[in-house]
Amino acid sequence: DPVVLDSIYRWDDKKVGYLLYNQFNVLSCEKLISVCKRFKNEGVSELILDLRYNLGGNSVVQQLLASMLAPEENVARNDVYLKRVHNKDYEEELRQKGESSEQLLQSRMELAINGEKFDYDLSDANIGITKLYALVSGKTASASEALLIGLRPYLDIEIIGETTRGKFCGGYNLSAADWYLNMVDTYREEGRDFYAEHPDLADWKTHVADWGMYVINYYFTDKTGVRPDFSKGLSPDFKVTDAPFEAYPLGDEREVLLHAALTRAGKTDLPSRSVESRSMNENYRLIKYPTFNSNARESGTP
């Protein structure tokens, strides 16, 4: 289950949600919607979204989550959230088919999961947050980066952690059957016989039935067309190094990235960050970790 943790931290009159999400998986949609409904009903005003281990996944699921985080008025207008940029030939093919390369914020979404269609009503799952704290690392990539890039024009986002991976592109899986059967159909439309012309490929299933390729065919931009630098990832507003071998579990207020986010959100009664931790070796040694300085911005960031 990629929806690993969901919590609400309360202090004074403030409620801040925390969601640890590890993959944009179509099977996680119902759980995501349920969590967002809970946050909405509990009156969460800000969200800490932990994407430090999220390498990406399905772009439609990313669109679904964005539609529950973006301001409700933008979702109601179906505003553009992301743009996909393909090569000119594919863009022309999309134009001729009347299809769009834009992803929109939506209050209702349809997805196909294992051949079964699902219709999700998100109208009562939009949390209504005013600020998003994104916890990231070098493992944060692809759909995770797209989510933050697409939401930036709509939402106050503070990125905490380390520079993300920098995979600002997407594509699709092409199986051997997809390729061969498409070629067979193409030949047939031209009045030709694929297997007669290529008898050596007649038994392709014997050799490559389980093969496939992941084909990159677009990069993404925000609604204004701003394109990320492919040579770099997203730089954090507040640089904090993850410490996965600390004694504190994910979700604990003393865990380094969550501690930083809660500090930035204004929580003042946090426990001390001075900890002792086990190393990876069974013959462990004690490691002293310094206290996080919540006011230290990374040099060169706004």
Predicted regions and their residues:
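Short beta-strand/loop segment at the start of cytosolic alpha/beta domains
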Residues: 1-20
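C-terminal "post-core" interaction segments
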Residues: 16-19, 23-48, 55-302
